């Protein structure tokens, strides 16, 4: 299973999909990308998080709830699909065996069942799932009890992957740039220094005191300071010297990094910038918001809507419905 950490090229990460094989206990298949990591990544960058919220809000805005599928269950499933590329529904039956309700199951914990759960010599059916609990146990669902909708991945057909996966490195880089800048200010607005004393006539006690003060002066993070005492160097120059480790003014490209990564993140999500509250940097602006919303509805919301309309095909009846926007009213 892949988590996020070291930057690696896309073409060198083929090992990622080896983890769609069975877990060590054989109870379920591991997803190619850790869904819990994807869920936490939602909070790493403002544009990344708000782009996903915008997608969810726009789809839920026109959803028509019913006795079969409530607005809450639908919204939670949409969040799962947008964030992880997977969503799951549990079927609830009446005494006659008809499906009367669908409830959301959390994608972070749902897994395709493995061989250890099946006695059928023909293997594991495609519609057999388990819910993995954080403490290690799991809940087993009956075959055909769970409906799984997923965003198709060309490298494996068991789990889906989110469409924004191509922008994950930009989300992480933007987060690292922000954290570095925060640590820089916590550190006292410097990147650290080397304090050197040579032939300064310091006693060992005085040298230890200076060392402790230097260690106590630095904050949490990147700016680390060092103290070097040379009791007898033979030099007659600069008995006390401060050597800067780095210059934040010339070495830091914070704004350039933030601007570039944010453009990449917005592109990965396919949401017009004006709909995310971005302030234009030029007099031309970012266009008409209503027109941008119409464009996103056609190229973003409608394709996502088709994913959930597939529930009607699975159930054999038209239970999932959406209303249409009134663009004239929005433009007024």
Regions found by a protein language model. Give the residues of each.
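Aromatic side chains
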Residues: 81, 88, 128-129, 185
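Short linear motifs in intrinsically disordered/low-complexity regions
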Residues: 7, 13-15, 26, 35, ...
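Generic hydrophobic-segment detector
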Residues: 16, 70, 75, 87, ...
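Flexible, gly/proline-biased loop segments at the beginnings
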Residues: 1-115, 158, 248, 289, ...
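Extended, charged amphipathic alpha-helical segments
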Residues: 2-3, 10, 131, 136-264, ...
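Short, surface-exposed loop and linker segments with low hydrophobicity and enrichment for Pro/Ser/Thr
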Residues: 79-82, 118-124, 186-187, 219
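Active-site and NAD+-binding cores of ADP-ribose-processing enzymes
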Residues: 32, 95-160
């Amino acid at each position: 299973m892949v988590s996020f950490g070291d930057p690696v090229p896309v073409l060198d990460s083929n090992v990622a999909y080896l983890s769609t094989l069975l877990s060590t206990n054989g109870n379920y298949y591991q997803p190619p990308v850790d869904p819990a990591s994807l869920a936490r990544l939602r909070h790493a960058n403002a544009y990344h998080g708000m782009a996903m919220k915008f997608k969810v809000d726009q789809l839920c805005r026109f959803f028509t709830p019913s006795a079969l599928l409530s607005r809450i269950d639908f919204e939670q499933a949409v969040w799962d699909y947008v964030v992880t590329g997977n969503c799951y529904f549990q079927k609830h039956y009446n005494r006659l065996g008809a499906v009367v309700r669908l409830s959301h199951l959390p994608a972070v914990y749902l897994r395709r069942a493995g061989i250890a759960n099946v006695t059928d010599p023909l293997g594991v059916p495609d519609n057999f799932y388990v819910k993995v609990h954080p403490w290690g146990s799991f809940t087993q669902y009956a075959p055909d009890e769970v409906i799984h909708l997923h965003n198709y991945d060309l490298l494996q057909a068991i789990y889906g992957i989110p469409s924004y996966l191509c922008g994950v490195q930009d989300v992480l880089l933007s987060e690292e740039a922000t954290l570095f800048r925060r640590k820089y200010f916590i550190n006292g607005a410097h990147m650290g220094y080397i304090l050197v004393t040579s032939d300064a006539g310091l006693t060992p006690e005085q040298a230890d005191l200076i060392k402790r003060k230097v260690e106590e002066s630095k904050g949490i993070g990147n700016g680390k300071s060092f103290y070097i005492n040379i009791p007898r160097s033979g030099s007659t120059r600069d008995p006390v010297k401060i050597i800067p480790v780095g210059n934040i003014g010339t070495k830091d490209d914070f704004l350039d990094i933030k601007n570039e990564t944010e453009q990449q993140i917005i592109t990965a999500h396919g949401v017009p910038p004006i709909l995310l509250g971005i302030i234009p940097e030029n007099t031309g602006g970012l266009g008409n918001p209503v027109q941008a919303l119409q464009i996103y509805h056609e190229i973003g919301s409608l394709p996502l809507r088709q994913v959930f309309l597939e529930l009607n095909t699975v159930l054999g009846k038209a239970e999932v419905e959406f209303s249409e926007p009134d663009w004239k009213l929005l433009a007024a």
